[in-house]
Structure formats: structure tokens, C-alpha cells
């Protein structure tokens, strides 16, 4: 058995999970096990105070951690405190951190050079740093997580698993923007994101449908605060809605998705700065911007119940954006065997699933209202007679990263 620690390091939070698995499980396991331990550090409200939460099968622990400086020094101390809960106290699972066989990291942007998980070395770190220009909110935090873990567990190998890797085989017509080609060759192209999630749920969908993934044409819908849709043909991503950055595509919680680029030129001419435009498209738009209420769909639905017309408009725009996004992926597939919903909204908002599917009846989509509203777990919520399956699948990105680590360890090490 191997012990895998999975880290998802962000700019204001860090999530971690611990799994034990046999090396060959990466290629054979279908239904993911629950993590043995889950940890969270959240310093989003105050850069000098982190909220620590740890959960195991039968224990839960919370604490507030403070550091006078915050920043990297604070995170280093907080991460050590988080990992201490693995080796001491009521959540203890390990005698020492040396029992961790391998550490897997989610990395948002791998550009065009990383099409599979890789062992982290100096060259990989340098590349992730270079790609920070493409993902300034994510890659630096991902890289910092690697650096800190190298200090804490210097003998433990680390693996980078890239969110862009699943989309690395996008055909040229899907990844190329209609801009001068020298810009394309300079790296400005559609990369796609949420790939770890899209790949996992497409594989899980094939298991639920009891059909080979190689013969399925699926659209996977990762709907959370960030949203993206992907056309998966025979297990390969052939089109996706996010692009050069995670700002593109469908309407999201705070991101605008696709808009006329002339809007940004117009605002630049009116004196807006690049930083202001960045905040506009990434933090002030989407459901939050249109509703004026929140990026949280639950609060928008509550506002709708209170008769707020702006909240209703935001919801309607969101549903329409997703319907249009789904339809836009059909040419890449030719036919549709299954529509897959995942992530926070996709898994937990039956009303959203219902309203999206209401506009897609022409595709052969017919929901079983009972399965949609009251069903639990991974399931098919389409009517048995419907020609297109509609699946709800709980995304398991941490497990997918752990599995990738297991697969990498089972490969022979080249000299």
C-alpha cells in the first residue's frame, strides 16, 4: 500500500486529503474511496489568521491559527500545524510524515507542454513559474505549496497534476483563436480548465452506463463558482468552453464568461486600468454582477423568492448561458449519449438541472423528476425511455490526483 497526500493550494486557502491505495489501483479502481483525512486552511477573511479544519472518519477538529506576518511565513507555520494533525492528537493517522509515500498537487495551468502528470523537479517548477503569467491567481500558489512541502518532507517525491492536461488533445480548430497566427504560436490559444474533474466524471459516467468510454459521446458540465462544459468523445476532450484563461466560456459566479472584447476596449478608452478590468471580468461579474445580490446561487434563489427581478434575470441568464454552451459543443460530437452534471451546483441544485434540460428536449433529453429531485449519489436522472442519459456524478478531484500518483508510481522509473 502507498500513502498519498493530495494538496490543492490556492491564494487564500489550502485543501489537503490523505489516501491509502495499492499502486495498481490507479488503473483499476472505479468507485473512489473516501479520504482517510481531510484538512483545510482558510485565511481569506484575514491574512494573519487561518481557520484550520480537519476531518477523519470519526473525528473533527477546528482551530484558529495566527501569525503576525501572514504571507509565506504564516502559511509555512500553518501548513506544519495542519500536517501535525496527521501525526498527533485525536486525528492522528501516521507515526510520522515519512510514512507519506508521495505528494500530489493540483496545478491549474500546464500550458501545452504538460499533457500528463509529472514528477516535480527543478525544471517542472521553473515551467510552472513561467506559466504563472497565464494563471496569476493560481500557479504561484500551486508552486508555493510544492516549495513548502519540499521543506517539510524533503525526501518525499512530489507529482504535479494539471487541470489543463485533459484538454491537451483539443483539435487545432478548437484551440485556435481567429487572431494573427504568430500570436497563436506564441501561446495564445484555448487551453481549457477543470480537466481533472471532466476526465474523472466522464470515466465514472461510462461505469454508470455500463458502456466503454471509447464509444461514448458526452458533455460534462462542471458547475460551481467556476463553470465549464466539455465535449468528451471516446474519452478525449475535443471541445471546451473555457479558453486561454478560466474567465472564458459560460456565465459563472463572479466571472463574466464570453463577452464582446470590444467592451474592454471601450472601457480602456474611458480610462479603466488593466487592474480594474481584471476585477470586473473575474470578481465583479457573472451571477454577482447581474443580480447585485451574490455569487452564491442559494442567495440568488432566496432573493427570487422575495420577488427580486434582478436576481431572476441573473438566474435566467445563467440557465440560458449553459443551454447555449451545451448546444455549442454538439458539432464536435456529432451525437450525444449523455449529459453529466457535477461540482457544487451541478450535484446539488436539482432546479438548475431541471431548467437547463427543459430547453434541451429537442436533443432527446427527458428528466425523471423524482430521480432528479430526490435521488442520492451518482445516478442517471433521465427517464428510462429517453435516448440521452442525464447523469449526476460527484466530482472527486482529490481522488483523481491520488490515483494519478498511484499510476505514476506503478510505471518503471527511467534512468
From Swiss-Prot:
Substrate binds at residue 106. Keywords: ATP-binding, Cytoplasm, Kinase, Magnesium, Metal-binding, Nucleotide-binding, Transferase. SUPFAM superfamilies: Actin-like ATPase domain. One of its GO terms (biological process) is acetyl-CoA biosynthetic process. One of its GO terms (molecular function) is acetate kinase activity. Its EC number is 2.7.2.1. It is found in: Cytoplasm. Gene3D superfamilies: 3.30.420.40. InterPro entries: Ac/propionate_kinase, Aliphatic_acid_kin_short-chain, Aliphatic_acid_kinase_CS, ATPase_NBD. It catalyses: acetate + ATP = acetyl phosphate + ADP. Signal peptide: none annotated. Pathway: Metabolic intermediate biosynthesis; acetyl-CoA biosynthesis; acetyl-CoA from acetate: step 1/2. Belongs to the acetokinase family. NCBIfam families: ackA. Catalyzes the formation of acetyl phosphate from acetate and ATP. Can also catalyze the reverse reaction. Homodimer. This is Acetate kinase. The lineage of its organism: Bacteria, Bacillati, Cyanobacteriota, Cyanophyceae, Acaryochloridales. The gene is ackA.
Amino acid at each position: 500500500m502507498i500513502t498519498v497526500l493530495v494538496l490543492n493550494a490556492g491564494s487564500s486557502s489550502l485543501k489537503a486529503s490523505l489516501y491509502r491505495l495499492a499502486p495498481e489501483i490507479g488503473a483499476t479502481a472505479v468507485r473512489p474511496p473516501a479520504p482517510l483525512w481531510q484538512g483545510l486552511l482558510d485565511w481569506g477573511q484575514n491574512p494573519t489568521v487561518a481557520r484550520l479544519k480537519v476531518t477523519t472518519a470519526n473525528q473533527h477538529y477546528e482551530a484558529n491559527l495566527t501569525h503576525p506576518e501572514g504571507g509565506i511565513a504564516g502559511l509555512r507555520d500553518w501548513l506544519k500545524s495542519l500536517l501535525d494533525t496527521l501525526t498527533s492528537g485525536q486525528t492522528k493517522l501516521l507515526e510520522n510524515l515519512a510514512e507519506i509515500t508521495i505528494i500530489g498537487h493540483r496545478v491549474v495551468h500546464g500550458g501545452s507542454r504538460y499533457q500528463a502528470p509529472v514528477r516535480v523537479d527543478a525544471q517542472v517548477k521553473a515551467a510552472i513559474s513561467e506559466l504563472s503569467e497565464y494563471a496569476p491567481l493560481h500557479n504561484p500558489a500551486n508552486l508555493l505549496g510544492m516549495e513548502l512541502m519540499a521543506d517539510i518532507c524533503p525526501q518525499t517525491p512530489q507529482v504535479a497534476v494539471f487541470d489543463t492536461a485533459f484538454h491537451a488533445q483539443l483539435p487545432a480548430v478548437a484551440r485556435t483563436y481567429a487572431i494573427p497566427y504568430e500570436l497563436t504560436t506564441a501561446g495564445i490559444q484555448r487551453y481549457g480548465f477543470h480537466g481533472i474533474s471532466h476526465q474523472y466524471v466522464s470515466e465514472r459516467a461510462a461505469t454508470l452506463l455500463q458502456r466503454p468510454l471509447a464509444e461514448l459521446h458526452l458533455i460534462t458540465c462542471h458547475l460551481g463558482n467556476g463553470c465549464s462544459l466539455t465535449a468528451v468523445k471516446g474519452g478525449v476532450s475535443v471541445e471546451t468552453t473555457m479558453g486561454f484563461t478560466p474567465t472564458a466560456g459560460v456565465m459563472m459566479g463572479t466571472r463574466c464568461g464570453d463577452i464582446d472584447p470590444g467592451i474592454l476596449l471601450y472601457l480602456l478608452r474611458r480610462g479603466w486600468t488593466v487592474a480594474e478590468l481584471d476585477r470586473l471580468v473575474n470578481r465583479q461579474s457573472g451571477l454577482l454582477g447581474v443580480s447585485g445580490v451574490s455569487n452564491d446561487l442559494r442567495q440568488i434563489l432566496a432573493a427570487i423568492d422575495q420577488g427580486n427581478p434582478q436576481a431572476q434575470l441573473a438566474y435566467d441568464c445563467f440557465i440560458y448561458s449553459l443551454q447555449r454552451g451545451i448546444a455549442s459543443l454538439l458539432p464536435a460530437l456529432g451525437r450525444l449519449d449523455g449529459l453529466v452534471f457535477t461540482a457544487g451546483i451541478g450535484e446539488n441544485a436539482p432546479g438548475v438541472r431541471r431548467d437547463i434540460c427543459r430547453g434541451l428536449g429537442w436533443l432527446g433529453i427527458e428528466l425523471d423528476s423524482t430521480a432528479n429531485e430526490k435521488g442520492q449519489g451518482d445516478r442517471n436522472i433521465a427517464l428510462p425511455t429517453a435516448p440521452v442519459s442525464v447523469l449526476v456524478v460527484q466530482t472527486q478531484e482529490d481522488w483523481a490526483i491520488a490515483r494519478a500518483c498511484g499510476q505514476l508510481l506503478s510505471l518503471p522509473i527511467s534512468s
